[in-house]
Each structure stands twice: as structure tokens, then as C-alpha cells.
């Protein structure tokens, strides 16, 4: 050994330190090389060439490592030495190929002495010949392919074999990562070795560490099974022992394997599961290597046909103290492509080698192409021939019994193609049968239905239709009554012929009910709710009182079944199919065309007639530009009455409400003598001819609470006059009249009057007071149960300009031919009925309801030159529809370019106390705003003097502050350019206003009006000159026991700068008593009729002479001054 004490062959994990033990790998000592020069280090390559020629490239050798001390040569060693020559016979068994048999070569190494180096023996103390060359196993292993090496030791005769030490030294087993430079340099020198090319082993250096770790894993796996036989972590523990034992060998090289293994197990137990995952993955790879290696060995045996090669057996360590067998073999198989094998675990795509399967050619063989073409040709041919063979196939199927009648299918197809047949089938099919089929209920009686169907087989079509109608009628009769007590009237009726010859007849709908539906046919159940969505606002109808979206109560009945039957007339494209079903559908809008105007000049049109049940308020159609709120009136339209100066053809609408109250009817225009016609169950709209005065038709109807009894649920509309004789009304609603009156009046007193809108929105409600504009300058009070209102023709109001209407509208073509027709006292039979005259054929919406519950109520209504005032009792007067906004509801045509407006100033100083007077005047305003900014307000005033204060260019509206609780329904009205229309805001009034209070406050009103006139006149004038106004045709309706009141007015409302107008603040106060006097004064050409007849005061009590207005001169002078200033 070297004198410096360093190890001649340190391992890869051992530093070259003096006294370091040698690696336990067995090495074979060869012939001693020549002495090393003193200046040459031990690790330098030796200049001596390799000794034995057996280590040739043709026979690569692989010397396996043995767990035994190194066998070294030399003399004077500390271990036992043997004198004489020793031989080390190395038997090398090479695998040369399938054609050659295995060869065994014996390598005999002679040496003078064999010395064992015991464990821990110092190497530097040895002296003697130079150290021999050692060929380590790592250097030889790199030379592939695998060979089995057996080494045996032999001594001279009589010399015992050396025995292994009792314990093997624990040292790192990882072979040298790099070959010892001396060996490689030696092999490259001289002879054929220097000329050889790099073998596969040289290319396997990169994966050499993984392979050797794999071999150690195989050995440690046997060792781990001895300690952890039942543990499933044997493979992972074996991987863990590789680095741990290496580290222990570095720390303490003299530590034996038995000492290091318990420490390694302790470290394994301390390791966390997460850290163990690395070794589990490594063990998984090694197990894959092992399985693949076994598969390759078996494949090699099969391919080579070498039965002598045994499968790999793991190396078993001998127990300590056992002798090394004479020939210890460790078969090792290294695949030819070692480099590619080591990369296989990373890819995990390597599969066992199998014989290659012939791949399909990339080209489609022509046979397959031809077959495909043949198949497609066959399919296409059969498809083409299908049309030709369909009849034959059908004939075959019919012959097989699929169709018992061959011509049945064709016959059915022919019948189904006829619309008449389909309609007949629908009429013939029993509705109960369809209901049973579609009913989800299981309890059905098919036998009874079968019997009923058998009975119907003998009936013809007419009988079946009649039976269906009767069945529907019975169903309607069985419908549970709603709060309005509506009943169905299924008797078909046809109104009288028109005065133009009666070429067309207007049939009224046969079935009517109380659900919010506008349709021709069966009515829906009254308990359903109708929802009206308009302008982002939604109101729900159904319940004790309608609830508006803003929280205000809407005077709408629970649900109205509106039956609107429209007669085909020239220029009236009215949609007969418009319906409001259930709770959400808005009524379809009518198309807006000039031909759609009702009552065109020169065309005796036939107008919609709403014949309905006596206890239901139906709704009417709406105009096209905007949606309409829930209309709930049944209206009969009479012939048009041309407006003089406007050329407007007005349609009289008749609202038929009540049941069997008395002989009150619809006022029609004609020259026939008055007549009373009683009818059963259903109302009729009768049209008279032009041969006589207005003809009234009486109706036997009875008010229902939904129609006249509920103040919160009934809405009136323009052109409709309601007569509510509350004495004949049996209230069935949860809200009583008095309670409603109190609540409305209390709320009205809390509201402040709001200014008129600059957009001329004439919506009336509890927010603003607006006096309707009187188009006709005649006022005819009518009263008494048996009085007849004869309209007087006088003082036509000329409104120049064209009317632009999108729905049934009015066009200015001619002036009013008859002015101020007076109602004859003989015609009106029952003052509780409703009358309509000179109103546009535009039906209102359920926005607000003004239905007087008193006996004597005076309600002036607008639109026309006729003002009919009937005194009613104000004790039970009530008006509802609080804050019912009517934005966007267009019920009237657009009136534009209106230069002259006559506005009535309604005042009365002799208003009796609420509940005391017999007569009252209820002014209900139905205002409509085209811009959707309608304000709902009700001006309920006592018109003792109705004075039109208007010149040709200015319009002053003096509103009285003595206003009752009445509220009008607000809706949008067509715009009209109102020039110089001034509306004065009145001061709010208090809760209860007596006649004395009114007289005292008139002086205060004067002063306030003067200030208001001076302040707002110029502002309003400037505002109105720039913006278009709205012409609201407001309806003032009331009903009582004394007569029917109607006033035709144009209610003008201008909302400028948002100035509030005083709301009605009076309590339960009626504004007009029975002795009230109505005086109408014409201004600038407004005259009475040619006969000079004064307004008639009709009623049971004599009406006193009208008092002179205190402010007539003042107002006139003020107007003149303003007109001059402009």
C-alpha cells in the first residue's frame, strides 16, 4: 500500500482521507505493476498495460460485487497471510449468442501471498511491494452486455481457504459514477482495446445511477422483507434505504449493516407521509422496471431459444459468518437499448414488445369505394322511387287491413282542407266532451257523456248551436255573483234599425258577464282580476277597491265583463276581436286612421253598441296612440251629431246601468215624438230619425253595487252620463256610501291644489281642480222623475282647426245644425237611468269613477253645445277614484288649432249643507293628457251661474273654491293648441262650507283671483303660445232620483310651472240644491236659440231666478284689459 496512508481505490462517496477503509466491493488482484515513481500520485494511471488478454472487446466481462472484504495481495499485512503462491480462478461465463454455446473462461491470478484486510484495518501501515491494480466492479459493469461471473479462490494444497470476517462492513454500495481513470486509460492503450468504438455501456453513463439504484433496490427489498414482512411499504422502504444507508456510511464508515438498518427504520417511521410519497413513486418506477425486465427476459428466451438462461433471481445475502460458496452467480440481464429503457418510466408509454401488426393502407381500396357507390346508388334509387310506389304501398297496407275504408283517408283530407267543415266540426263538438278530455280530474262519467252525445246525433246543426248557446247561458247563470252582482244575459238581441234605412243592424252581444273582458261571447268569471298596464303604471281591478301603483285607491269594480259589439260601418275599422282576458291583457288599440273616425260626414255610419247586463259596467275601446285603462262601461252609440263650427261628428254614448229602475232611456237625435220602450233584461241603443225631437228609450234595469253603489269602484268617462238613483240601489259592497264619502272628503281636504300643467294636461283628480270647458253655451237644468229633457240649440262654439284622432275620432266638417236642444220633461221616465247625447264615441277607462249616490245630483258633462243639468240629492253624494292617474290614455281625438275656447265659471252661493239639500251639482272632470302627465282632480261645484268667460283669443277659467269631494277620472286627452287660455287657480277651501261661508269667502277669492290673474296670465300665455295643449273632453256624470244631468264641455287644463291648484276641500257638501239656478251667459256672440228661450229649470220644485254674479263686470273688464295688452 502507499506510504502516505491513502486508500488506493476510494469509493465515489468516500473522500480520500488517510486511514479511510476500502470499499467492500470485491476486486481481483492482478500481477503487480511496476513500482510507482515517488512523484506520481496514487490516483494517476499506471503505465503498465493490461495483463490478461482475456479482457478483450469481444468478451466483455462483468465482475459482480460481493459483500466481502477486499482481497488484496502483499506481504506484511495485518491480516492473515498465506505463504506460497495463491491462485484466484475467475470463471467467466459469456453469452455469445444463440448460435454459440456458453463458454466458461478461467482466469488464474497468481500471487505470492493473499492477505485479508479486516474491517477497520488501517491501510497506511502496510509496507511492501507496490499496491496491485484493482479492477472494480463498477469499471467492468459499464462494459455491456451482461455476463455471469463466478469467482472462486483456491490455494495450494494444504492451505485452508480464507474465511470471511464475521460481519460485513457497511459502506456505500453505489458504484463509481465515473470509471476509474487509470482503468480506462489502461484499456485505451495499445492492442486492439485502444481501437474499439464506444459501446452501449458508454452511452449508458447518464442513466447509470438510476440503474444501479434499481439494483440496490432489488437487494434492499429482500433485506426489508426480513424486517417488515407484513408491511406494504417494503418497496418504498427499500427505496428509502438507498440514500439513508449511503448517508450513514458517509457519517460512520465503520458502521455495519446490522447497525445501520435499525437506524434507517427509525428514520422511516419519523418521515411524514408527504415525504414518503417520493419513495412510493420511486418504488413504483422500480416495480415497473422489474416487471419489464422480466418480460424482456422471457421474450429473449423465446427469441433466442436459449434454455440455459434462467430468470432473474434477487440476490440473497448470506447470514453473517457463512462461507462464500465456491461459485456465486448473479445473473444480470441488461437490455440492448439501455438508454431508451431508462427514459421509458418517464413517458410511461412503453409497452411490451409484440409482433408488429400490419397497418391498414392509407388509400381506400377501390373495392370499398365501389361498394360505397353501389350502396348510395341503391339508397338514392329507392328514395326516388318512393313517390311512385307510395300509392301502391298504401294500397297494400289498406289491403292488409290498416284502413278499413280505402277512400277514408283521402276523404278526411278533403274535408279538413275546407274551412267551413272545420268550423262546423268545432260547433258540433260538445264542449263538455272537450272539457272532460282536457280536464286533469279523474272523476269523470263517460257513460253520461256518451248518452248525451247519442241524443245529439239526431239534431241538426242549428239545433246543436242553439243547444250550445243554452248551455253557455246556463253556465253563465250558474257563475257565482261577484260583488257587483252581475248576471249574464244570453238572449240575443238586435237593436232597432238606424234612421238611414236600417240596411245594417247592430246585434248586441248575446253573452255578457262581470269579468274584465272586452269580447263578443262568453264572459269570464267575475272574481277574476284585470290588470291594466299603462305608461309603467299598473292598476289591479278586483277586490273591494282597486289599488293604484302609487298607493291610491282606484274606483274599479272587482272585475268587469265588458261585452262590446261593434257594428260594421263605413270608415270604422274597429277590432271586434279585442279582448281583455283574465288579469293581464290590455285592450287592443284601434287603428288610427281617418277612415277609423266614427261618424264621418256624409257616411251614415253604424257605431259600436255595448249592450250589456243591467248590473255590470262594461268598458269601451280606446284610441290608438296610447293604452287605455280598464274601461268598464257598457255604451250604446247613437248617430253622430255634427258640431257647428267644428265639423265634428259626435257620437252619443249611452251608458246602460241599473236594473228595472224605471223608464229612463237613451236620448237620441230624431224628430219622432217621444216614446218609451221597455225591454226585458237587456238594454238597447235606439237610433231615431231626424223627424222629431230627441227620443228616449227606457230600460228596465237595476243598479248594481258595482255599477252605482260603490264609489270607489265605478269610473265614469267622457260622453257617458250616469244616473244613480241611490234610493233604488241595493248596496252589496263592503264599503258603504257614507264611509266612502267621508274618506274621500277627508282626503280631499288634506290635499293641496296643484297648478295647472303647461302641457295642457286636463286630468282631474284630487290634485288639481279644473273646470271643464263648455263647448256648447246652453245650460238646461232638468229635474223631476217625469221630466223630459229637450236639448236647445243655441250659440254654437266654433273651434276652427282640424281634429287629429287615431282612434274613433271626430273630424271638423260641419257646424252644429241644431243648437241647444232642450230635453222634454215628458220623455224622461226614470231619472236614475243614464243618458248620452253629443258625446264622442270614445269609451273611457277605469281610471276613476264619479258616481253620485245621492238622489239629486247635478253633473255637467262635456263635449257639445248642450248643457243639461239635473238636480239630484246631495245627501249621499260621493265621488271616488282618488289619485287615479291616467297617463297616456287617449280617449279623444287630437284637437289642434283651437283659437276660441269657452270656459264656464261655475259658482253657486246658495249651496246647502251636505245631507240637507235635495239638489246638488256634481262636476266631475274626466281629464286626459296626451303626454301622460294627467292629474286627476275633481271639481265638484255648484253651478248656479254657468258663465262662459271667453273671447275669441282668451280663455279664463274661474274655478270656485267651494268644491265637493267628487273626483274625476284622469286620462290622457288629445292635444289641442289652446291660444291664450288662462286658468285661474282657486284658493283651497276648508272642510265644511256652508252658504254663509261661501258668501264670506267670495270676497277673499276675488282678491286672490285678481292677484293670480295678474301673476299667471302672462306666464300662462307665453307658455301656451309655445306648447300644444290638450283638449280634455271631460264628463260630469251624476245620477239621482230627480233627473239626468249632462253637460258637454271641453275641460281645459293648463299646468304651468307646476303651480298647485286648490283641491276640493269641502266635506260632504253638495254644491247645487234643488232651487239652484243655472244661468249661462254667452260672451261675444254666444246667444240663446232663435226662439230666445231661456234655460229651463226642470224639477219638482220651482227653481228661483238666478242671482247676478258679483264679478261679472270685474272679470269682463279684466279680460278686456288683458286682451288689449296682448
Curated annotation (Swiss-Prot):
One Pfam family matching this protein: NUT
UniProt KW keywords: Cytoplasm, Methylation, Nucleus, Phosphoprotein
Composition-biased stretches (Basic residues): 338-353, 1106-1126
Stretches the record annotates as Disordered: 1-56, 334-367, 475-515, 537-559, 664-692, 755-810, 932-1014, 1032-1126
Protein location: Cytoplasm; Nucleus
PTM characteristics: Methylated at Gln-1042 by N6AMT1. Phosphorylation on Ser-1022, Ser-1025 or Ser-1027 is important for cytoplasmic export.
Modification sites for N5-methylglutamine: 1042
Record flagged with keyword Phosphoprotein: yes
Highest rank taxon of the organism: Eukaryota
GO cellular component: cytoplasm; nucleus
Extent of Polar residues compositional bias: 962-975
Chain positions found as Phosphoserine: 973, 1022, 1025, 1027
InterPro entries in the record: NUT, NUT_N
Bias (Basic and acidic residues) ranges: 987-1005
Protein task: Plays a role in the regulation of proliferation. Regulates TERT expression by modulating SP1 binding to TERT promoter binding sites.
Similarity comment text for this entry: Belongs to the NUT family.
Protein name: NUT family member 1
Organism of derivation: Mus musculus
Amino acid at each position: 500500500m502507499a506510504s502516505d496512508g491513502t486508500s488506493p481505490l476510494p469509493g465515489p462517496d468516500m473522500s480520500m482521507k488517510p486511514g479511510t477503509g476500502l470499499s467492500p466491493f470485491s476486486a481481483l488482484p492482478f500481477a503487480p505493476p511496476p513500482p510507482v515513481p515517488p512523484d506520481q500520485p496514487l490516483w494517476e494511471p499506471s503505465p503498465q498495460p493490461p495483463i490478461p488478454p482475456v479482457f478483450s472487446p469481444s468478451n466483455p466481462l462483468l465482475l459482480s460485487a460481493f459483500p466481502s472484504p477486499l482481497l488484496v495481495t502483499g506481504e506484511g499485512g495485518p491480516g492473515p497471510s498465506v505463504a506460497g503462491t495463491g491462485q484466484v480462478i475467475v470463471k467467466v461465463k459469456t453469452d455469445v449468442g444463440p448460435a454459440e454455446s456458453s463458454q466458461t473462461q478461467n482466469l488464474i491470478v497468481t500471487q505470492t501471498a493473499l492477505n485479508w484486510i479486516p474491517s477497520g484495518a488501517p491501510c497506511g501501515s502496510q509496507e511492501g511491494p507496490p499496491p496491485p491494480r484493482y479492477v472494480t466492479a463498477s469499471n467492468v459493469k459499464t462494459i455491456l452486455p451482461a455476463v455471469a461471473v463466478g469467482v472462486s479462490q483456491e490455494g495450494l494444497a494444504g492451505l485452508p481457504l480464507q474465511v470471511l470476517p464475521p460481519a460485513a462492513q457497511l459502506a456505500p454500495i453505489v458504484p463509481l459514477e465515473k470509471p476509474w481513470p487509470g482503468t480506462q486509460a489502461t484499456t485505451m492503450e495499445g492492442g486492439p482495446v485502444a481501437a474499439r468504438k464506444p459501446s452501449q455501456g458508454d452511452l449508458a453513463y447518464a442513466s447509470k445511477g438510476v440503474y444501479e439504484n434499481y439494483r440496490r433496490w432489488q437487494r434492499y427489498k429482500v433485506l426489508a422483507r426480513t424486517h417488515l414482512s407484513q408491511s406494504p411499504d417494503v418497496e418504498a422502504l427499500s427505496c428509502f434505504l438507498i440514500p439513508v444507508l449511503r448517508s450513514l456510511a458517509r457519517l460512520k464508515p465503520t458502521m455495519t449493516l446490522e447497525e445501520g438498518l435499525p437506524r434507517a427504520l427509525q428514520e422511516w417511521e419519523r418521515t411524514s407521509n408527504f415525504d414518503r410519497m417520493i419513495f412510493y413513486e420511486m418504488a413504483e418506477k422500480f416495480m415497473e422496471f422489474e416487471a419489464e425486465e422480466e418480460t424482456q427476459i422471457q421474450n429473449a428466451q423465446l427469441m433466442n431459444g436459449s434454455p440455459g438462461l434462467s430468470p432473474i433471481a434477487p440476490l440473497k445475502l448470506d447470514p453473517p459468518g457463512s462461507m462464500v460458496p465456491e461459485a456465486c452467480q448473479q445473473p444480470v440481464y441488461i437490455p440492448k437499448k439501455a438508454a431508451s429503457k431508462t427514459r421509458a418510466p418517464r413517458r410511461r408509454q412503453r409497452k411490451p414488445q409484440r409482433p408488429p401488426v400490419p397497418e391498414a393502407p392509407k388509400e381506400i381500396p377501390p373495392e370499398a369505394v365501389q361498394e360505397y357507390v353501389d350502396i348510395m346508388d341503391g339508397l338514392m334509387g329507392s328514395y326516388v322511387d318512393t313517390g311512385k310506389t307510395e300509392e301502391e304501398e298504401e294500397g297494400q297496407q289498406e289491403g292488409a287491413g290498416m284502413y278499413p275504408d280505402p277512400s277514408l283517408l283521402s276523404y278526411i283530407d278533403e274535408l279538413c282542407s275546407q274551412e267551413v267543415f272545420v268550423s262546423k266540426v268545432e260547433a258540433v263538438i260538445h264542449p263538455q266532451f272537450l272539457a272532460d278530455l282536457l280536464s286533469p280530474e279523474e272523476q269523470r262519467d263517460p257513460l253520461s257523456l256518451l248518452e248525451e252525445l247519442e241524443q245529439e246525433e239526431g239534431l241538426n246543426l242549428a239545433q246543436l248551436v242553439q243547444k250550445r248557446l243554452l248551455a253557455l247561458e246556463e253556465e253563465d247563470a250558474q257563475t257565482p255573483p261577484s260583488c257587483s252582482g252581475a248576471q249574464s244575459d244570453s238572449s240575443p238581441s238586435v237593436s232597432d234599425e238606424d234612421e238611414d234605412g236600417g240596411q245594417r243592424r247592430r246585434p248586441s252581444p248575446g253573452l255578457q258577464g262581470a269579468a274584465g273582458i272586452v269580447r263578443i261571447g262568453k264572459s269570464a268569471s267575475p272574481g277574476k282580476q284585470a290588470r291594466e298596464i299603462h305608461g309603467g303604471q299598473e292598476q289591479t281591478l278586483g277586490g273591494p277597491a282597486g289599488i293604484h301603483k302609487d298607493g291610491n285607491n282606484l274606483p274599479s269594480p272587482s272585475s268587469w265583463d265588458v261585452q262590446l259589439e261593434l257594428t260594421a260601418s263605413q270608415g270604422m275599422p274597429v277590432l271586434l276581436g279585442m279582448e281583455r282576458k283574465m288579469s293581464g291583457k290590455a285592450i287592443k288599440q284601434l287603428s288610427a286612421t281617418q277612415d277609423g273616425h266614427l261618424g264621418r260626414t256624409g257616411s251614415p255610419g253604424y257605431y259600436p253598441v255595448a249592450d250589456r247586463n243591467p248590473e255590470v259596467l262594461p268598458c269601451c275601446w280606446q284610441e290608438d296612440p296610447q293604452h287605455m285603462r280598464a274601461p268598464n262601461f257598457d255604451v250604446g252609440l247613437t248617430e253622430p251629431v255634427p258640431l257647428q263650427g267644428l265639423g265634428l261628428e259626435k257620437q252619443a254614448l249611452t251608458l246602460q246601468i241599473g236594473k228595472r229602475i224605471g223608464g229612463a232611456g237613451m236620448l237620441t237625435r230624431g224628430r219622432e215624438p217621444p216614446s218609451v220602450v221597455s225591454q226585458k233584461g237587456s238594454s238597447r241603443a235606439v237610433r231615431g230619425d231626424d223627424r222629431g225631437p230627441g227620443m228616449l228609450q227606457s230600460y228596465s234595469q237595476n243598479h248594481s253595487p258595482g255599477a252605482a253603489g260603490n264609489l270607489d269602484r265605478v269610473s265614469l268617462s267622457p260622453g257617458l252620463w250616469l244616473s244613480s238613483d241611490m234610493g233604488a240601489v241595493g248596496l252589496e259592497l263592503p264599503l258603504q256610501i257614507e264611509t266612502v264619502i267621508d274618506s274621500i272628503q277627508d282626503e280631499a281636504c288634506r290635499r293641496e291644489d296643484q297648478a295647472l300643467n303647461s302641457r295642457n294636461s286636463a286630468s282631474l283628480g284630487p290634485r288639481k281642480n279644473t273646470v271643464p270647458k263648455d263647448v256648447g253655451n246652453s245650460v238646461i237644468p232638468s229635474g223631476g222623475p217625469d221630466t223630459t229633457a229637450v236639448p236647445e240649440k243655441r250659440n254654437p262654439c266654433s273651434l276652427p282647426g282640424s281634429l287629429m284622432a287615431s282612434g274613433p275620432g271626430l273630424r271638423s266638417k260641419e257646424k252644429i245644425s241644431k243648437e241647444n236642444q232642450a230635453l222634454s220633461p215628458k220623455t224622461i221616465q226614470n231619472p236614475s237611468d243614464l243618458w248620452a247625447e253629443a258625446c264622442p264615441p270614445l269609451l273611457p277607462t277605469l281610471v276613476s269613477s264619479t258616481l253620485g249616490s245621492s238622489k239629486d245630483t247635478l253633473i255637467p258633462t262635456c263635449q257639445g253645445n248642450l248643457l243639461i243639468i239635473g238636480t239630484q240629492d246631495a245627501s249621499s253624494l260621493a265621488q271616488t277614484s282618488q289619485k287615479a292617474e291616467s297617463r297616456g290614455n287617449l280617449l279623444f281625438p287630437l284637437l289642434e288649432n283651437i283659437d276660441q275656447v269657452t270656459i264656464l265659471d261655475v259658482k253657486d252661493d246658495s249651496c246647502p249643507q251636505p245631507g240637507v239639500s235635495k239638489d246638488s251639482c256634481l262636476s266631475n272632470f274626466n281629464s286626459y293628457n296626451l303626454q301622460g302627465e294627467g292629474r286627476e282632480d275633481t271639481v265638484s261645484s255648484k253651478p248656479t251661474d254657468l258663465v262662459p268667460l271667453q273671447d275669441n283669443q282668451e280663455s279664463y277659467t274661474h274655478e270656485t273654491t267651494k268644491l265637493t269631494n267628487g273626483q274625476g277620472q284622469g286620462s290622457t286627452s288629445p292635444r289641442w293648441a289652446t291660444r291664450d287660455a288662462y286658468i285661474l287657480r282657486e284658493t283651497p277651501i276648508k272642510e265644511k262650507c256652508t252658504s254663509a261661508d261661501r258668501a264670506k269667502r267670495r270676497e277673499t277669492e276675488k282678491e286672490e283671483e285678481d292677484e293670480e290673474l295678474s301673476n299667471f296670465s302672462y306666464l300662462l300665455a307665453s307658455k301656451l303660445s309655445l306648447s300644444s295643449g290638450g283638449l280634455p273632453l271631460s264628463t260630469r256624470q251624476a245620477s239621482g232620483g230627480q233627473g239626468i244631468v249632462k253637460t258637454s264641455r271641453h275641460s281645459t287644463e293648463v299646468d304651468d310651472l307646476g303651480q298647485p291648484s286648490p283641491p276640493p276641500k269641502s266635506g260632504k257638501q253638495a254644491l247645487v240644491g234643488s232651487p239652484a239656478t243655472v244661468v249661462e251667459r254667452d260672451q261675444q256672440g254666444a246667444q240663446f236659440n232663435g226662439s230666445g228661450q231661456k234655460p229651463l229649470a226642470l224639477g219638482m220644485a220651482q227653481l228661483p231666478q238666478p242671482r247676478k254674479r258679483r264679478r261679472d263686470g270685474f272679470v269682463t273688464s279684466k279680460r278686456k284689459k288683458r286682451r288689449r295688452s296682448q
